[in-house]
Amino acid sequence: MEQWESRGHLLTEQINPNSLNLDQLNPLELVDLFNREDAQTLKAIAMARQELALGISLTSQALAKGGRLFYIGAGTSGRLGVLDAAECPPTFCTPPELVQGIIAGGAAALVRSSEDLEDKAEDGAAIIAQREIHELDVVVGITAGGTTPYVHGALQAAKQRGATTIAISCVPAEQVEIAVDVDIRLLTGPELLAGSTRLKAGTVTKMALNILSTGTMVMLGKVYGNQMVDVAVTNHKLHDRALRIICHLTDVSREEAAILLEKSGRRVKLALLMQKTGLSAAAGQELLQKHRGQLRAALQAYNQID
């Protein structure tokens, strides 16, 4: 991609005038400078609020129809996608295939830098074919500088297969055009350490992924109030959290919550429905399935019948 050989014009590659004396600062001055610059991330998210909201809407609609969400990137961008995807099963009890993170170079690139692999657009296209991306899926390409061939190859291939495509980058559209359904631009300006996009660009990207995945799960009914009622109860900490969620939302004792949790097969959402309706685990599960796992909708339907 010869048009991208010179990258000095990109916002993420430019020199930050606020950090020209970076190597002369003492530790406290360094911390204060980073703190001031990181404030740009909040502004960038605010400026991209419409695109982020559209991304949530399209992604939740696709997943509700049986689609999957894929993050794809290289280097820091790829690692952030893998991280966000990995957090979905324990937080929302989703199957691991529902939200997947793909990084150029595979698992080895998570712990060892493999920057050269990002230059192969054909590899990005190949991974889309390998994962059998289809029209119900959503593919989020993450590239801070907007030019990563691996990501562009993946997005183009995904689009050809009819998938919904979303791009997350930290450069303005006039610098790099990305042909996608939702174009999220997170403009945090030049990095304190010139070109080191693991800094502000990485931070704001993680913020955007937090919003996109959590917002999608909220729309899918994985949350009740502000509680993670689909939490996977897989260790002592999460068992304690599950009990506290049940206690908070029902006012039962911790001992009663523990009994409910076991009767529900350690499914918090089902335990809540059982307590609030008096239904058996089987009947409660049937009602939840009828309402696509939406606890609030299931409760409203039960109360109308009752």
Curated annotation (Swiss-Prot):
Q: What PANTHER family is this protein classified in?
A: GLUCOKINASE REGULATORY PROTEIN
Q: How does it assemble?
A: Homodimer.
What's the protein name? N-acetylmuramic acid 6-phosphate etherase
Give yes or no: UniProt keyword Lyase.
Answer: yes
Catalyzed reactions? N-acetyl-D-muramate 6-phosphate + H2O = N-acetyl-D-glucosamine 6-phosphate + (R)-lactate
Q: Does the keyword Membrane apply?
A: no
Extra remark beyond the main annotation: A lyase-type mechanism (elimination/hydration) is suggested for the cleavage of the lactyl ether bond of MurNAc 6-phosphate, with the formation of an alpha,beta-unsaturated aldehyde intermediate with (E)-stereochemistry, followed by the syn addition of water to give product.
**InterPro entries for this protein:** Etherase_MurQ, Glucokinase_regulatory_CS, MURQ/GCKR, SIS_dom, SIS_dom_sf
User: What are the SIS domain coordinates in residue numbering?
Assistant: 59-222
Which family does this protein fall into?
Answer: Belongs to the GCKR-like family. MurNAc-6-P etherase subfamily.
Assigned EC number? 4.2.1.126
What is the species of this protein? Microcystis aeruginosa (strain NIES-843 / IAM M-2473)
Q: What pathway does the annotation place this protein in?
A: Amino-sugar metabolism; N-acetylmuramate degradation
- Keywords of this protein's UniProt record, alphabetized? Carbohydrate metabolism, Lyase
Q: What does this protein do?
A: Specifically catalyzes the cleavage of the D-lactyl ether substituent of MurNAc 6-phosphate, producing GlcNAc 6-phosphate and D-lactate.
Mind listing the GO biological process terms from this record? amino sugar catabolic process; N-acetylmuramic acid catabolic process; peptidoglycan turnover
